[in-house]
């Protein structure tokens, strides 16, 4: 939409790094998510989308995500437990006012698991890295959490108030090579980038998100999902 104003706060995703940890930037112009219980139909629609856009755009990545067990990732922890619900989700995800009210910022990343290294940890150590119990998905009490736990370093707080995002992560890959596609929505892009910066950057005590010792980020891009009213207005 070259004649439309840029959504407030929309930024290109910039690569991040600290020590031997990195989040690469792999920009894209358009992200399409197809959701269906019929893999064959989703694939058919995807094929025609690629053909339809072929004169003006190249498909640079095509991932098939899937639900794994009881909404677990492929390191076998439940993913998305702390997602906001109901009206809290609406407040966390949707831009509240202005031209793009009802739209949302979207961050996409692909992570590949370093499974052998992860499997070498004891279950207790794995739970320390994640900040939740593995089998029954119970959050470890704050006083007992490791300062490098994933749910500590990825949490965004401003003046003591947690700023939520909504995740629709999906397991991806094969038995040989697999991981997670991070799909994060937020009312402000800064919520998403702040979370990543806290994860990857070691604090004054040297703590960063230790989950990054067991996964490798391979892609990263920021998008904006416009509200339906905006799409209706420009298409007439």
Locations of regions flagged by a protein language model:
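Long, histidine/aromatic-enriched segments associated with O2/redox biology
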Residues: 1-236
């Amino acid at each position: 939409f070259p004649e439309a104003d840029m959504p407030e706060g929309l930024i290109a995703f910039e690569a991040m790094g600290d020590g031997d940890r990195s989040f690469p930037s792999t920009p894209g112009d358009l992200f399409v998510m197809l959701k269906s219980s019929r893999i064959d139909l989703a694939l058919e629609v995807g094929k025609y989308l690629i053909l339809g856009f072929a004169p003006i755009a190249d498909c640079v990545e095509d991932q098939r995500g899937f639900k794994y067990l009881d909404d677990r990732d492929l390191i076998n922890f439940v993913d998305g437990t702390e997602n906001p619900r109901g009206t809290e989700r609406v407040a966390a995800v949707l831009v509240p006012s202005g031209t793009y009210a009802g739209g949302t910022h979207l961050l996409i990343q692909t992570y590949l698991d370093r499974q052998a290294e992860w499997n070498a940890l004891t279950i207790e150590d794995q739970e320390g890295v994640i900040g939740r119990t593995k089998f029954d998905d119970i959050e470890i009490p704050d006083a007992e959490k490791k300062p490098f736990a994933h749910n500590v370093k990825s949490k965004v707080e401003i003046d003591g108030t947690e700023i939520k995002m909504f995740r629709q992560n999906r397991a991806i890959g094969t038995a040989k090579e697999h991981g997670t596609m991070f799909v994060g929505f937020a009312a402000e892009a800064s919520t998403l980038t702040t979370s990543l910066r806290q994860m990857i950057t070691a604090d004054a005590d040297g703590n960063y998100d230790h989950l990054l010792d067991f996964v490798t980020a391979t892609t990263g891009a920021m998008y904006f999902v416009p509200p339906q009213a905006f799409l209706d207005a420009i298409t007439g």
